[in-house]
């Protein structure tokens, strides 16, 4: 399902040589999951009648704040592959069979939306950065996407695999570096994710699988990144600077392993606290790169990958942010769930809408943040154009 995007009117001029976001598109699978109906439908399809699990899932569905998600996995998928809902079944082959095709198709659809908004020919794309934690094969989805879009066989490709929730901003950082160091280049960045690899029947020994069932969704996003926009292009965000760091000795807090049954995840209960304890210093380092000591955190617009609602609440409290500052992150979580690497761009799309409504009163500077395995912090200082 393609999601329409539109061209924004430029309000400020980008600094010479700085990478900008020239267009953004997204795509979602056709299967819509309403959180209100999830519990009964999910348990019925996987043939689970455990009342304790039902109660826990109902509680999680309310606490995640998610209202709607989109998934590749459907009733038809489970009927075709019933072993996906069978405990202990070696199903990695079937999962990859579904996921490999699905992630490229969603990336293709998001790219079409993005390229249409951009308004230039596909032949003008010089580089491709392809991000996914949901497929595994050689050659990778970057090659299949290039062929499907009709990109030049000399397009310069980069793949980023299995980064999780911070993958979108990592891809954006790589795209920024490419754009700023290759004059005239235009970089297509795509992110595409599906929960098919991690779908598991509920088990009391694996409580995190229920969190996944209540929180995660599927989808794709695509952006065109380039420096020194032409008259025909309409940049809406300048990528002023990027920063990444990991927290030492936290490798086990977010743990994912590929097995014969798919991907298994473990999430430490101390994740929100670890982020809260370290986020203020990280943000202040980024803000300092704006070259203005007068900027306060509440002077900025914010695009924060939510992970889950506890991370947003902790960050808001720690940084003393006004409630409206994280509204776009909360609405994206509500509308799509946690869509891993895509989520930051769904939020950025909502931020774009809000800044357009504010017009000249909109904030000039903002922060983009995402957190993932490592624990890795990925951040951007951005400028509203």
Curated annotation (Swiss-Prot):
Residues annotated for substrate binding in this entry: 217-218
SUPFAM superfamilies: Thiolase-like
Gene3D superfamilies per the UniProt record, alphabetical: 3.40.47.10
Residues engaged in binding CoA: 56-63, 267, 307-310
Assigned EC number: 2.3.1.-
EC main group: transferase
Protein name: Type III polyketide synthase C
Upper classification of the organism: Eukaryota, Viridiplantae, Streptophyta, Embryophyta, Tracheophyta
